[in-house]
Amino acid sequence: VLKAISCGREPTDVELASVSLPEGTVWIDLLDPTSEEIGWTERNLGVRIPSRHDLSEIELSSRLAKEGENMYLSAPVIGAATIEHADLTPAGFIVTPHVLITVRFETLPTFDIVAQRLEHDKTLTTSMAVFVALMEAIVDVVPTYLSTWLLP
């Protein structure tokens, strides 16, 4: 699924027949993307979309890279979680000067929270602002699970 997310609007599906993004798009979210969606994103935004294998690399040197003006990051993110267990899933972040591109392979509640926030928060107008909001949401859920697992 390839979604375009803009400040003040609901997320919209990107038409692969189009060569441009909806006006005001600050975040492209690729959820379990098809090869067509990956190809569209690479062609139209001039980025390299990392594979699931690339995003799953555990070496620190594989987690952060800069290519031209684009910053590539990967991190394990808490996906499905219960009181006893949490699944970690790889997620990728490409911060470009104009748009944040995320790549994930599972539904992640933290991403949904930030997407909903963008509908109402008029301050998230840049790729970096959206990236920071996502990082805050990801970090904010960790103490909840840690306290549940570590405290009797």
Regions found by a protein language model. Give the residues of each.
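Peripheral, non-transmembrane regulatory/ligand-interaction domains of membrane transport proteins
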Residues: 1-152
